[in-house]
A protein has these predicted regions:
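Boundary at the C-terminal end of the N-terminal hydrophobic targeting segment
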Residues: 19-23
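N-terminal segment of the mature soluble domain
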Residues: 36-91
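Amphipathic beta-strand/beta-sheet edge segments enriched in Tyr/Trp
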Residues: 95-140
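Short glycine-rich His-centered loop
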Residues: 27-39
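Bacterial N-terminal signal peptides
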Residues: 8-16
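A short, hydrophobic beta-strand-centered structural micro-motif
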Residues: 25-29, 78-108, 112
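Positively charged n-region of N-terminal signal peptides that target proteins for export
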Residues: 1-5
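C-terminal partner/receptor-binding element of secreted or periplasmic proteins
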Residues: 132-160
């Protein structure tokens, strides 16, 4: 009987200590699209890729509402996102990931995507990556490529 109780206690302690996960907050910024337009499908694909990959890797995920701008922000990204980072920190986020999706005026496809990963406390840049827009044969190819790009970011969190 003592062995059973010891075994149950061991399993309980094992699961209690492994029950935590990092929380990652996402923020999508669209620039170069008219403010009155509808949600862009490519922005939605990026957001879905972030959620899918990070959730599948065991992270708690949340997001801020997408923001649409006429052009890239004039101030530094760190200053521009400060309110969103503060809100994420207050919500318990450990990491904050920004995807700035830049569109050219004559296309609804992204011309460039900047992905920037920050540690929230203390606030510091971990990884920055720029991706040039591409044309894909199918939506499945595009989704697979986006997920692979995002999968390359996940190990950076594990380094900290």
């Amino acid at each position: 009987m003592a062995k059973k109780i010891t075994f149950v206690l061991f399993l309980g302690v094992l699961f209690v200590f492994n029950a935590s996960a990092y929380m990652v907050s996402f923020f999508i910024i669209e620039s170069g699209l008219p403010p009155e337009g509808t949600k862009n499908q490519y922005s939605q694909l990026w957001e879905n890729a972030f959620f899918d990959v990070f959730f599948d890797a065991g992270y708690i995920v949340c997001n801020s509402p997408m923001m649409r701008l006429d052009s890239k922000p004039k101030m530094s990204l760190e200053n521009f996102i400060q309110d969103e980072v503060d809100e994420a920190r207050d919500g318990g986020a450990d990491y904050f990931l920004v995807a700035q999706i830049d569109f050219s005026r004559d296309s609804l496809r992204p011309s460039e995507v900047s992905i920037v990963l920050f540690k929230v406390t203390p606030f510091r840049l971990i990884k920055e990556k720029k991706i040039t827009g591409k044309t894909y044969k199918s939506e499945k190819d595009e989704i697979d490529d986006l997920r692979n790009i995002v999968k390359g970011i996940v190990p950076k969190i594990n380094e900290f």
